[in-house]
Amino acid sequence: MSCINLPTVLPGSPSKTRGQIQVILGPMFSGKSTELMRRVRRFQIAQYKCLVIKYAKDTRYSSSFCTHDRNTMEALPACLLRDVAQEALGVAVIGIDEGQFFPDIVEFCEAMANAGKTVIVAALDGTFQRKPFGAILNLVPLAESVVKLTAVCMECFREAAYTKRLGTEKEVEVIGGADKYHSVCRLCYFKKASGQPAGPDNKENCPVPGKPGEAVAARKLFAPQQILQCSPAN
């Protein structure tokens, strides 16, 4: 006869889940959606009830949640997360793809985590101008887990942390794949895209106006000999 009394509900079972927010950031083509899918499937194998939400205006892959390499998963399309709140309350794990496009991403994730849900968000951290994308970075201090993935630079094959737009559109929200964007490293980000005119009309990827030689001159201000001259005397 066993002397061990096990509880009816084990601590790790779905009915005893503790809310949390997991954030997966990175540029395009860094594997954010693939990682989101992997994490959700991991919970599905453990018999957790899961829901994936995708941005409704992204119609490239029909109504399914899809990675760039065409792996798919059933998803619920939405433009505002509050519109699918009732469906989200009925599951244990919520996956959100393209989180940067949802204006209510912060409030929704915090409310769901406080309700005991595990919320996994995949999102771009920056725009093609390397500025914060929507409200997504406001989710970072609320999250239990945050990772930033890198891609491979599509121009020089080094590590890529940024997204570079190939076209001339000015608006932030332009949905597309490799036909409109490249993942790039720091050096390639500032290179003029092929087909774009040089000069003041091509400012998207330019840090400061001026000639290329001026950047080199600026670096010389911080040459080792100058730094030594500014050091306090012993």
UniProtKB/Swiss-Prot annotation:
Effect of residue 13 to A: Loss of phosphorylation. Constant expression during cell cycle. No effect on ATP-induced tetramerization
Enzyme class, spelled out: transferase
Disulfide bond positions: none
Binding-site residues for ATP, renumbered to this chain: 26-33, 58-60, 97-100
InterPro entries registered for this protein in UniProt: P-loop_NTPase, Thymidine_kinase, Thymidine_kinase_CS
GO cellular component: cytosol; nucleus
Result for mutant: residue 203 to A: Resistant to degradation in the mitotic exit phase
E.C. number(s) listed in UniProt: 2.7.1.21
Protein name as annotated: Thymidine kinase, cytosolic
Gene that encodes it: TK1
